[in-house]
Amino acid sequence: MTQLTKKQKSFQGKVDSNKLYPLADALGLVKECATAKFDESIDVAVQLGIDAKKSDQVVRGAVVLPNGTGKTKRVAVFAQGAKAEEAKAAGADIVGMDDLAAMIKAGDMPFDIVIAAPDAMRVVGTLGQILGPRGLMPNPKVGTVTPDVATAVKNAKAGQVQFRVDKAGIVHSTIGRRSFDTDKLQGNLAALVDALTKAKPATSKGVYLKKVAVSSTMGVGIRVDLQSIAA
């Protein structure tokens, strides 16, 4: 039998694992149960009514959370000429081509997101085995391969999150930090749900948004009443 930690025991009585909570109440409980000494991330798991084994039902995309994520993203951009200058002006932390590729091959990757202009993919394509496993490979489906590198950089800096359904049909994402006001977390979750709804595969049948649960980095998952999410 699994032993409960002291912290988990303290949550007992506060959270009913079988109950569907209105979103505001669920987030309030998550914040209350987030007792770590650091500003815990507030995360969401959304169960979708899709068959993740089918290639035409893979849900993937990106959305700019209206209230940000609470984390400053470091952005690297593969671009040259005018596009490189646009990326720098938009706030990119690192801009380059072969020199940036050499950094990455040497294991020097001081960034969280990689963006590439289309003509830079000849260089980026050689880095697939390094960037791919880390979830950093640029992809047009999430807006990280684009001729408009400036907008992509601004979106990344403004709190854009990428999402992709896993093998179990669940999308995991952060929606902010414990220090965020509940209404800001609600706004971010509503934006994510709206993006997921718009990304619904045409071949998906039946109920699409099946379950939603919110949690903190070190806390318990709390199920949310879908009717309380205003997207």
Curated annotation (Swiss-Prot):
GO molecular function annotations of the record: rRNA binding; structural constituent of ribosome; tRNA binding
One of the GO biological process terms: regulation of translation
Record key words, sorted: Repressor, Ribonucleoprotein, Ribosomal protein, RNA-binding, rRNA-binding, Translation regulation, tRNA-binding
Pfam family of the protein (one): Ribosomal_L1
Transmembrane feature ranges: none
Coiled-coil parts of chain: none
Alphabetized InterPro entries for the sequence: Ribosom_uL1_bac-type, Ribosomal_uL1, Ribosomal_uL1-like, Ribosomal_uL1/biogenesis, Ribosomal_uL1_3-a/b-sand, Ribosomal_uL1_CS
Family matches, as PROSITE patterns: RIBOSOMAL_L1
Keyword Secreted: no
Top-level taxon of the source organism: Bacteria
Gene Ontology, cellular component aspect: cytosolic large ribosomal subunit
Oligomer status and interactors: Part of the 50S ribosomal subunit.
Family as reported in the entry's similarity comment: Belongs to the universal ribosomal protein uL1 family.
Biological role: Binds directly to 23S rRNA. The L1 stalk is quite mobile in the ribosome, and is involved in E site tRNA release. Protein L1 is also a translational repressor protein, it controls the translation of the L11 operon by binding to its mRNA.
This protein's name: Large ribosomal subunit protein uL1
